[in-house]
Amino acid sequence: MAFQKQSSGGGEAALAILRIGTGATLFLRHGWEKQPMHWAQFMAHFPNPIHIGAHASFFIAFVSDFVCSLLLTLGIWTRWVALFSFCNILVAWALVHRFAFFGRGPGSDHGEVMVLYLVALLTLVIHGSTAFSVDSVRGR
């Protein structure tokens, strides 16, 4: 059967699509809204799940959702930025959204999306970048 046939470059291409898709959607949905011109509106009500202050918590989310998502999309320091974003999303899912998954109640309307991000990011932490990344051009 054709489905059983493995291609040599398919895995690399699939992981590149996963990396680019994860980074781009994280940036477009969560990073773009955290750009510096919008910081004032976030500071007033940003959660403080690990008790380091709302400003510090927002800065961690900004680095994860804005900076790391762009680096992930380009394939720069893939494992490290995926790990940073994974940790940030895991903390948000656990401590802010209380592991909500099915969307029953306030703040639980996108738990399944958080799980999908976590699975994709963990895959990228384990595998790293692919041949289709800046890391591979730089020889890392």
PLM regions with names:
Residues 34-53:
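Membrane-interface interhelical connector segments
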